[in-house]
């Protein structure tokens, strides 16, 4: 149980997805980490616009939260995370010494939903490949400790999904960003909801949506069937997948995930 694992560690390194930084926050984490050091890492910063990151940072600051934005795959932003972890270690060491306790390597837990990039982040922090990393949910399957040079023992936990993910909007966002396995959702329904979200967010600069880019890519104006997104997908399927709506839905989602439609943020600061 996650709450039991958290009791065994000194530091939580929480990893979220920049495209959906709210949906990838664990709903119960705050009540579990009351007396723990907490570093918030928002990975995949390369997948949204720099202006969106700046505006999200302002939003988080107003809520007294100071995340580290990074692109673990390409190693950007890793130094700041390592610096923050080292500062946390020194603070924990001081606290132990003040209580007459021996200094020991601190125990840190990397935590996040499946496929938010925890393994890539750990490999960057460790400066070598210590865990498997792949763009699919569920690569990490067991708890394992990794000894780092910086006096930190890092616990790599499998991606955690709350058993009752009550917020349906969050569940949809996780599916769109491939942060939960494909077996957990119906791909055609998710593709239709994706089009609805695109049309809802099209005026928000933070979402960074180009309807022209999407329309040109598929050869059908996305505003043509604005009230019936499934009809737009059917028209696009005729052009690209011989009328196969399921294949087209899969292609649409993969195009989004691979940034073929631009650096689109599915959640924006309010």
Which role does the model predict for each range below?
Residues 1-11, 19-20, 25-38, 66, ...:
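Helix-rich effector regions associated with P-loop NTPase G domains
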Residues 14, 40-42, 110:
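Structural beta-sheet core signal
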Residues 16-19, 45, 125, 158:
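Anionic group-transfer/hydrolysis microenvironments
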Residues 27-30, 54-57, 83-84, 123-125, ...:
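Short, glycine/charged-enriched secondary-structure capping and boundary segments
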Residues 36-46:
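Active-site cofactor/substrate anionic-group-binding motifs, chiefly glycine-
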Residues 45-112, 130:
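Canonical P-loop GTPase G-domain recognition
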Residues 92-96, 123, 129-135, 202-206:
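Short, structured loop/turn "capping" segments at alpha-beta junctions
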Residues 107-127, 131, 157:
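Glycine-rich phosphate-binding P-loop
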């Amino acid at each position: 149980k996650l709450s039991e694992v958290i009791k065994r560690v000194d530091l939580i390194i929480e990893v979220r997805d920049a495209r959906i930084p709210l949906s990838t926050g664990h709903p119960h984490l705050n009540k579990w980490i009351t007396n723990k050091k907490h570093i918030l890492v928002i990975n995949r910063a390369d997948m949204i616009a720099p202006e969106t990151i700046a505006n999200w940072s302002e939003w988080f600051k107003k809520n007294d939260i100071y995340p580290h934005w990074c692109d673990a795959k390409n190693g950007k932003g890793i130094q700041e995370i390592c610096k923050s972890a080292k500062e946390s270690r020194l603070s924990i060491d001081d606290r132990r010494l003040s209580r007459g306790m021996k200094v020991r390597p601190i125990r840190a837990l990397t935590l996040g939903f499946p496929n938010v990039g925890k393994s890539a982040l750990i490999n960057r922090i460790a400066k070598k490949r210590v865990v498997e990393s792949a763009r699919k949910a569920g690569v990490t399957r067991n708890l394992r400790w990794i000894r780092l040079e910086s006096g930190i023992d890092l616990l790599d936990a499998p991606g955690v999904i709350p058993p009752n993910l009550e917020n349906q909007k969050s569940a949809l966002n996780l599916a769109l960003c491939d942060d939960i396995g494909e077996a957990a959702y119906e791909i055609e329904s998710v593709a239709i909801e994706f089009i609805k979200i695109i049309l809802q967010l099209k005026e928000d600069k933070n979402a960074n949506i180009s309807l022209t880019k999407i329309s040109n890519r598929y050869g059908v104006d996305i505003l043509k069937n604005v009230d019936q997104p499934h009809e737009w997908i059917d028209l696009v399927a005729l052009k690209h997948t011989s009328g196969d709506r399921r294949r087209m839905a899969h292609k649409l989602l993969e195009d989004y995930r691979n940034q073929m439609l631009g650096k689109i943020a599915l959640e924006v600061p309010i």
